A protein has these predicted regions:
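Intrinsically disordered, low-complexity, charged terminal extensions of DNA damage-control enzymes
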Residues: 1-38, 44, 194-215, 219-221, ...
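Catalytic cores of DNA base-excision repair glycosylases
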Residues: 27-247, 257-259
Length: 405
């Protein structure tokens, strides 16, 4: 790991072409990873199923948040067949709190495809993996390389940031052209390294066979090199070449190759893009209870929080009188509005990727059990705790119910 001055001099001396930077990055990262890999539960036994579930969970979700969910999911559903046979409510309950629930629904769809077409096994083929519901380029690359040792890249935001800095790229790293460029360069670099190491291993095996009684070499690390490389870039981007704040260039195994480090541009690369402000939506949440049970509403099958259970509500901030009127309408008992009691609950806020909800809550007590419409269902606190997957946007009100408000 050289100084900035040394790196700048190196660039002036021989100005590496980009393919050379990518090729030199492979052995450097593999060596670094062998000593600095993060200890993560899904790396202990990286079967295709384990890699698949972990990679889907890790989409747009922090590593620390995934750990407990991963262990619980595998305990409940240890293989593809068990996922294919699980009910949607059970799957959503296991996913409760992770968000982006379309992910678990796609897992269920993919599991059924795997059972129907692939004997319940993930295929050792990038193109076939790419055809499965919920699996895009990155996830297919991660599964193919980590679980099967196939020399393909897994390109996500971490990878794009790392190689934007290494190559000195000043444009928008989210552009399709840059993603394509990085993906192709990494594919060539990983393939070349893997083939080179396999050639060396084959030559070593041939030499050892000439020695009577010599053991035959088994290049286990060579076979896993593509997966180790992709995980190395993930770890580098998460712990060293970080997105916000100052990257830890002094600890980076690629600093001798890095244009941004050599030219003191790590703060400018990748280029900052202006974030659009999320719209704020005011909502009123109605926790309607008949004494022992709470009324839940099933959201539509498409759209935000598709198919999830929620507490009924309306758009806008309602007064207590308006909240009682809204509850009476939901219960189809408009004429009995005066018999309802509305109690203010704490306000709550939830941030989605594209919108923020600011919620005002009311508890509405009804004097007797009323049969709700088809999209509604009464549930006890135990059922909410153990069986019904209530969207995490309503966690404040869910927790109040479980505490017996």
């Amino acid at each position: 790991m050289g100084s900035r001055k040394e790196c700048a001099e190196n660039r002036k001396t021989f100005e590496k072409r980009e393919p050379e930077r990518y090729r030199e990055a492979v052995p450097s990262l593999l060596f670094w990873y062998d000593y600095n890999a993060r200890i993560l539960p899904w790396r202990e036994d990286p079967t295709p199923y384990h890699v698949w579930i972990s990679e889907i969970m890790l989409q747009q979700t922090r590593v620390e948040a995934v750990r407990a969910y991963y262990d619980r999911f595998l305990t409940e559903l240890p293989d593809v067949q068990s996922v294919a046979e699980a009910s949607e409510d059970r799957l959503v309950k296991l996913w409760e709190g992770l968000g982006y629930y379309s992910r678990v629904r796609n897992i269920a769809k993919a599991a059924k495809v795997l059972c129907d077409k692939h004997n319940g096994q993930l295929p050792a083929d990038y193109a076939l993996l790419r055809e499965l519901p919920g699996i895009g380029d990155y996830t297919a690359g991660a599964i193919a390389s980590i679980a099967f040792g196939i020399p393909v890249p897994a390109v996500d935001g971490n990878v794009l940031r790392v190689f934007a800095r290494v190559t000195g790229y000043r444009g928008d790293i989210r552009s399709d052209s840059f993603k394509k460029q990085v993906g192709e360069q990494l594919r060539q670099a990983i393939s070349a390294y893997t083939e080179e190491q396999n050639e060396k291993s084959r030559g070593k095996c041939a030499e050892e066979k000439t020695i009577p009684g010599a053991p035959v070499a088994h290049p286990t690390k060579v076979q896993s090199a593509p997966g180790r490389f992709n995980q190395a870039v993930m770890d580098l981007g998460a712990t060293v070449c970080i997105p916000n704040g100052k990257p830890h260039c002094e600890d980076c195994p690629l600093s001798h190759l890095c244009a941004a480090f050599g030219e003191d541009l790590t703060a400018e690369i990748p280029a900052k893009t202006e974030k659009k402000a999320r719209p704020v939506e005011k909502r009123t949440v109605l926790v309607i209870t008949d004494g022992e049970r709470v009324l839940l509403h099933r959201r539509p099958a498409k759209g935000l929080l598709a198919g999830m259970w929620e507490f009924p509500g309306v758009v806008g901030e309602l007064s207590p009188a308006a909240a009682k009127k809204a509850a009476a309408g939901i219960l189809r008992r408009e004429s009995e509005e005066k018999g309802l009691h509305a109690k203010r609950l704490p306000d709550s806020r939830h941030v989605f990727s594209h919108v923020e909800w600011e919620m005002r809550g009311y508890r509405i007590d009804v004097p007797e059990t009323i049969a709700p419409g088809a999209e509604y269902s009464w549930a006890t606190p135990r059922e909410i705790r153990e069986e019904r997957g209530v969207a995490s946007a309503f966690r404040t009100y869910r927790d109040l119910i479980l505490k017996g408000i």
